[in-house]
């Protein structure tokens, strides 16, 4: 099976690559159209700000390509947020919302934590919707590792939720696009199982 990690220019790819290799796969890191289209499974990791990430995707001419992918794609952390429509996380002085990949019509918003510190960093519990294959064999309220200050609110595509001040989407799914706000590659056995589930879909 051909597993490709999209080289977005805005992610630490080594930890994701290592986690996939530990599961017995040989992932390829690429931004080439032919390689991406030939993949059986794709991963879209991301760190940093939404506006910087979209700038990188635009420079690499990946935006139209990602939107038309038909194979399963897993967005990780910022990679999940990029599937939304807009983000409040802007680099510009005007503070305008950033247009994202618009795979789903949901915003990314700064977390309302009711006094809890940002970023939301560390281990927190994830409650998946019953029966979703991405969480097969993973206990309800399993702990995963988070680092973020922005989140997607609960919506039609939410398949798991987490509470930090407010409840937010910790995993989403729409058609062939899946996303997790946490870092499965840094989440021990539960994270490894989630990656395994995705790769075996």
From Swiss-Prot:
It comes from Photorhabdus laumondii subsp. laumondii (strain DSM 15139 / CIP 105565 / TT01) (Photorhabdus luminescens subsp. laumondii). One of its GO terms (biological process) is L-histidine biosynthetic process. Residues 2-201 form the Glutamine amidotransferase type-1 domain. This is Imidazole glycerol phosphate synthase subunit HisH. CDD domains: GATase1_IGP_Synthase. It is found in: Cytoplasm. Keywords: Amino-acid biosynthesis, Cytoplasm, Glutamine amidotransferase, Histidine biosynthesis, Hydrolase, Lyase. It catalyses: 5-[(5-phospho-1-deoxy-D-ribulos-1-ylimino)methylamino]-1-(5-phospho-beta-D-ribosyl)imidazole-4-carboxamide + L-glutamine = D-erythro-1-(imidazol-4-yl)glycerol 3-phosphate + 5-amino-1-(5-phospho-beta-D-ribosyl)imidazole-4-carboxamide + L-glutamate + H(+); L-glutamine + H2O = L-glutamate + NH4(+). One of its GO terms (cellular component) is cytoplasm. One of its GO terms (molecular function) is glutaminase activity. It comes from the Bacteria. IGPS catalyzes the conversion of PRFAR and glutamine to IGP, AICAR and glutamate. The HisH subunit catalyzes the hydrolysis of glutamine to glutamate and ammonia as part of the synthesis of IGP and AICAR. The resulting ammonia molecule is channeled to the active site of HisF. Its EC number is 4.3.2.10, 3.5.1.2. Its main location: cytoplasm. InterPro entries: Class_I_gatase-like, GATASE, Imidazole-glycPsynth_HisH. Disulfide bonds: none annotated. The active site is at 77 (nucleophile), 183, 185. SUPFAM superfamilies: Class I glutamine amidotransferase-like. Heterodimer of HisH and HisF. Coiled coil: none annotated. Pathway: Amino-acid biosynthesis; L-histidine biosynthesis; L-histidine from 5-phospho-alpha-D-ribose 1-diphosphate: step 5/9.
